[in-house]
Each structure stands twice: as structure tokens, then as C-alpha cells.
Amino acid sequence: EPGSAFTWQTGVLTSEVVDIVESRGIKTAILNVSFTCHMPDCLEMPYQPAVRGAEMGNEGEFIYRLGGNSCLSGDYMGLWSFDHELQIGERIVFEDMIHYTMVKTNMFNGIHHPAIALWTKEGKAEIYKQFSYEDYRDRMS
């Protein structure tokens, strides 16, 4: 990736667990982000983001598939091993995702874009852009 010389470790994509479902022995943590809408490189090529506090793979006690919030049947990413049982409302942080999240996103079926924010030195999130229905509507015209 030629651009990685300039855009390495650009920022995180923070998501939240909205539900946990189990089918055929696989637990899926449904997130409030979408792999197809917010992280398409994870589906289009073999890019595996680092997930804070987790390891890729099925070794360990707390194994989850991470699922996106779109209606696309393939909107999920692999199996991840966590050191604890995930809870609804818990934050899941994808490292080094902003460089593609902001330039390759789409609003498939009206899926919201994540807000663009920076953490201040005081630890407060300062929001620069919050996307709305009007942003979705305007992209359609």
C-alpha cells in the first residue's frame, strides 16, 4: 500500500455491541457499525484490523464473530477471541481504520456513518461532523 508511508495509525473506529446472538454454536456480537459500509477493505481484500483487547482466531474461552448492522448476509468479520464475555453496550475498538473508513464508506440502505471526532488532551471527544438523514438523502440526488 503506497499510502501507508503517510497514513499509518490514522485513528480508530469505535463501535458498540448492540446484541449478541448464537446460532449453530457461533456467538455473533452485532455491532453498530457495518463492515460493508464502514470497513469495506475487510471484506474486499484480506485486511484484518486489530481489535483492541482481542486476538483473531478461535482459541480461548470467549470467541465471537463480529457482525455488522446492515442487512447484507456477509456483513461480518471472522472469529475473535476476547479475554472476557462481551456485554451489550460494550465498546469494540478497531485500530488504524480511519484512512479507509472515511474515504470508502457508503450508506447502503441508509446505514449511518460514524461521527468524525478527536480526543482532546483532557480525554473528551470533540465531534467535528455528525452525519444525518440529509447527508444520506443528498447523496441519492
Label each PLM-derived region with a short phrase.
Residues 2-141:
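Charged (often Lys/Glu-rich) extended helix/loop segments that serve as interaction or gating elements
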